[in-house]
Amino acid sequence: MVKRAVVLISGGLDSTTCLAMAKAKGFEPVCLAVAYGQRHAVELEQARKVAAAMGVTDFRVVSIDLRQVGGSALTADIEVPKDRPSDEMSHGIPVTYVPARNALFLSLALGLAEVVGSTDIYIGVNAVDYSGYPDCRPEFIRSFESMANLATKAGVEGAHFTVHAPLSGLTKADIIREGVKLGVDYGLTHSCYDPDAQGRACGRCDSCVLRKKGFEEAGVPDPTRYTESA
């Protein structure tokens, strides 16, 4: 019997690799993307392309307007930091943190999992290269999993939900190497927080810098379309 898993997908490098890993484990993925008012909405179109390229037949988008909440450079009129040194990137919580984003995303995935009869949820959080986001930490994932089994009908009736975060202990280079082994086309992915009108990556935000560094350290050509000034 085919086992289904809900996979949170953003169209980025990490979530795309996570999807490939879920498929490699034999799961039939139900992909869930979230339109939350993010300034880099181009990632949603890339998520569709990634899912189609991987043969996903169940792709869903849930809309939740976090611009009404604000508090982040991704959802409000706050400038996205550029050209930050690595030591600055590794300390503190950056303004690109979206308040409670992964808690919200996982809650949506949990509800969908219960509806489609799945007990497995995949999320591509990674805390090795970038430890600034509190909702990317393994302890958060474990805590959410515990909550999931207390807060759902399926959970209290004996089903056990598992939140898989297979990238949590990997560097960006490790993630890329794993994805290459699994046949991921990274040319379809988008990571930039502040792309131009053509969807090209700025090459200077934290996400772009980490992506560039990952490809360089992995020894894999970077297929990203950057702006001419990047």
Curated annotation (Swiss-Prot):
It is an enzyme of class 6 (ligase). Its cofactor is Zn(2+). It holds the Pfam family QueC. Its EC number is 6.3.4.20. InterPro entries: QueC, Rossmann-like_a/b/a_fold. GO terms for molecular function: ATP binding; ligase activity, forming carbon-nitrogen bonds; zinc ion binding. One of its GO terms (biological process) is queuosine biosynthetic process. It comes from the Bacteria. CDD domains: QueC-like (cd01995). HAMAP family: QueC. This is 7-cyano-7-deazaguanine synthase. It comes from Myxococcus xanthus (strain DK1622).
